[in-house]
Amino acid sequence: TFGTAGTGGFGVRNTSIGGYSAYIQWVVAIFMILFGVNFNAYYFLLMKRFKQAFDMEEVKGYFLIIAAASALIFINIYNKTMTAADTIRHVVFQVGSLMTSTGYSTVDFDLWPSASKVVLIIIMFIGACAGSTGGGIKVSRVIMMLKSVKRELNAYLHPKSVRMIKMEGKALDQGAISSVAVYFITFTLIFAVSFLLVALEGRDLTTNFTAVLTTMNNMGPGLADVGPSKNFGGLSILSKYVLMFDMLAGRLELFPMLVLFHPVLWKETWEGGKRRRRLKRKKSLEN
């Protein structure tokens, strides 16, 4: 329950949620997805502002992505070795688990076809809604970036046109749009550097890529050597330190962790410490 509510994904069995009944798996899947919703939607529902809750663009996009990803994977993996009901359950569970960064698993999705794994990687990048317990880049940021791309394309086609980017019916200022662009650039830079450092260990591309992806977005399992049936225990010390940083940076939305390494912060901290020591010595001499 706690692992689902906090989208933390901690289990007490080696088989994760795969060791429980189909009923339990459906319950966990539903609540994982619900905890990935922007909590403002629940506030609107409690206040009986149903139109605002159901008109939230991010929430609609979130459920649309889950539905589309589940449908694509179902079509790709369905065969006669498993019933349609079981296939749907496992697909919805894994899509919900990775979309919300919970990280539970009912099957070894590393054995799924390549197309299904690509879909899972995409939703691992996107993540849950802003204002939820989930990780990832967040659906709202992805929507804003897509709208920014659309506006730039329209500007090329109609140079004199002026178009505002709106979210939830409200126009966004340029500062908000720029902050999202900066976040994407920062995410890409940290991802690239981490990927390079982890790749020094010499493992395969899939392991290195998904190890960085799953830790930066706080997903849990990746693919190949860090897949759902394996763990990160075999990685080198360097890789583990890099991935530890990625986990913290991803959970804190990148910038708080980067600020810790800014020279100005250390300079001010050092100078502040020196001032306090001087004042302490001065008081001791006066006494």
Region annotations inferred by a language model:
Residues 1-287:
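Membrane-proximal intracellular helices of multi-pass ion channels
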